[in-house]
A protein has these predicted regions:
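Conserved metal-binding segment of the jelly-roll/cupin
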Residues: 76-77, 228-247
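Conserved AWS/pre-SET-to-SET junction and N-terminal core of the SET lysine methyltransferase domain
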Residues: 203-231
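Short, small-residue-biased leader/transition segments that mark boundaries at the very start
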Residues: 2-7
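N-terminal functional module of multi-domain proteins
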Residues: 14-15, 20-106, 110-114
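Long, charge-rich alpha-helical interaction segments
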Residues: 135-211
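Short, structured patches in soluble enzyme cores that scaffold and shape functional sites
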Residues: 78-80, 111-121, 130, 142, ...
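C-terminal, non-catalytic macromolecule-binding modules
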Residues: 249-300
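A short glycine-rich, His/Asp/Glu-containing loop-to-beta-strand
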Residues: 10-22, 62-67, 289-304
């Protein structure tokens, strides 16, 4: 209810509030709720955007700002590069897939790099953990059902190994998933009780299973950095970076796109082959950008 609390609208939970011109949900003008920011920009893009921006971005506002409030974990997802988005958008248009179809992947021809800044403490999964550290986590869990996949990563402790393990985990059969997740639950509970190094990762895994059941995304989450942003800290999600927001309120700036490829932890459309096509499997070693000291001025929030 984070956004409802901020804007005093608490009739129902609100996960996102968009400020932009994207056709999926253009912002309404405070002075005229029948007119959108998209309408204003379209009427005179050179005046509203400036000639250089209007020329470079085909008369479109190039970014989308969101307030995001995650009470429960959001989907495991990644976003395409510009070339991938353009190709995917053209392909689905040629196939006659309606823009509002629930199984459509590409709603526009734009990429979607994004940066999120925590307004509260903000928990997320972001990018692949360094493979050696992931091996240490799996060794601590010591789940026999996962050992074949652990050995795959041990044999190739790099992006190739991460790709192989994730490809295997995300395509397990329902019976295999149930067996692996049940065994990993028991191991994670043991690590939580021991209150050792991998408590946060174990608690997160258990929470995902509680929320989504035998979902492959819960196992894939064990490959990712589990991070916590303090207020003012940020993380940049480049194209192809696998991530999932877990809990907290943040402000997010991104390219003007709504292209999302999902791989789990959701009831929405999942397209595993397309997700694996766009995901980058290199480890993310230093994900968090520290907060800068800021002060309030007549121009808003500026560096101190």
């Amino acid at each position: 209810r984070g956004l409802g609390d901020v804007y005093k609208r608490q009739e129902h939970p609100e996960a996102e509030m968009w400020f932009g011109t994207h056709s999926g949900d253009p912002a309404l003008l405070a002075t005229d709720n029948d007119r959108t920011l998209r309408d204003v920009v379209a009427a005179d893009p050179t005046h509203e955007l400036g000639s250089a921006t209007a020329h470079t971005f085909a008369d479109n506002l190039p970014f989308l700002l969101k307030l995001l409030a995650a009470e429960e974990p959001l989907s495991l997802q990644a976003h395409p590069s510009l070339a991938q988005a353009q190709e995917g958008y053209a392909r689905e248009n040629a196939q006659g897939v309606p823009l509002d179809a629930p199984d459509r992947n590409y709603h526009d021809p734009n990429h979607k790099p994004e940066l999120i800044v925590g307004l509260t403490r903000f928990h997320a999964l972001a990018g692949f953990r360094e493979p050696q550290r992931t091996l240490e986590l799996f060794d601590a869990l010591n789940v026999p059902q996962l050992q074949p996949y652990v050995e795959m990563l041990r044999a190739e402790p790099d992006a190739t190994g991460i790709r192989a393990v994730m490809t295997t985990l995300i395509t397990l059969t329902a019976d295999q998933l149930r067996e692996c997740i049940t065994a990993t639950q028991e191991a994670a509970q043991r690590l939580v009780a021991a209150n050792g190094e991998w408590v946060d990762e174990s608690v997160t895994f258990l929470g995902l299973v509680s929320e989504y059941g035998n979902d492959a995304g819960a196992l894939c989450a064990l490959l990712l950095n589990r991070i916590t942003l303090e207020p003012g800290e940020a993380i940049f999600m480049k194209s192809g970076m696998l991530h999932a927001y877990l809990h907290g309120v943040g402000v997010e700036i991104m390219a003007n796109s709504d292209n999302v490829l999902r791989g789990g932890l959701t009831s929405k459309h999942i397209d595993v082959p397309e997700l694996m096509h766009v995901v980058q499997f290199d480890a993310l070693l230093d994900p968090i950008a520290p907060a800068e000291n800021v002060v309030l001025s007549s121009h808003g929030i500026v560096p101190a």
